[in-house]
Swiss-Prot record:
Nucleoside triphosphate pyrophosphatase that hydrolyzes dTTP and UTP. May have a dual role in cell division arrest and in preventing the incorporation of modified nucleotides into cellular nucleic acids. The keyword Hydrolase applies. The keyword DNA damage does not apply. It is found in: Cytoplasm. It comes from Exiguobacterium sibiricum (strain DSM 17290 / CCUG 55495 / CIP 109462 / JCM 13490 / 255-15). InterPro entries: ITPase-like_fam (IPR029001), Maf-like (IPR003697). This is dTTP/UTP pyrophosphatase. Gene3D superfamilies: 3.90.950.10. Its cofactor is a divalent metal cation. SUPFAM superfamilies: ITPase-like. Its EC number is 3.6.1.9. One of its GO terms (biological process) is nucleotide metabolic process. GO terms for molecular function: dTTP diphosphatase activity; UTP diphosphatase activity. The record marks 18, 74, 156 as: Important for substrate specificity.
Amino acid sequence: MILMITQHPLILASASPRRTELLRQIGVPHTIRPADVLEEAPYPMTADEYVMYLSRKKARAVAKPGEIVLAADTVVALDQQILEKPADQPAALEMFRLLSGRTHEVVTGVTLLQDEREETFTVTTTVRFCEIPESWMLSYAATDEPYDKAGGYGIQGKGGLFVEAIDGDYYNVVGLPINPISRRLEAFGIEPMFA
């Protein structure tokens, strides 16, 4: 188990249960303070630009003096199209049909912020879906799982059945690339300790 020790509280600017669980899994104590921001691009952006813009916006929205804030935003990108969370079952089915049998990218923008110090970066993972049977799409869309996830699927849940191959950081697809975050947290005074 990895224990992280810090003199400053780490604030997670997200209500995502997956992000919270990943931080707990690697032993990073944190406080949850979701950012209430409009998740909309001010002008056309690439997936990388968009997730960096939103992660910065989220971090700045919850930041208080002295605190270290961790904010992230994840999207699925296919052919320059950004797929966020589906609003309803028809939107989820449309996403599954778009992604079926194809390779897409999962892009997460991460911002670490403390006072005037800010570091923002992206991590991209390539995911290939199988040809998804229509019956699987319908069954999955009937669950609650797709509707709070970029691209409408959770690789760590039933949506993992769609995944044929992955190239890159698995945890990035879940919603938080824990290795690069852990390495960068060291520069903010949060040192990993193995116990």
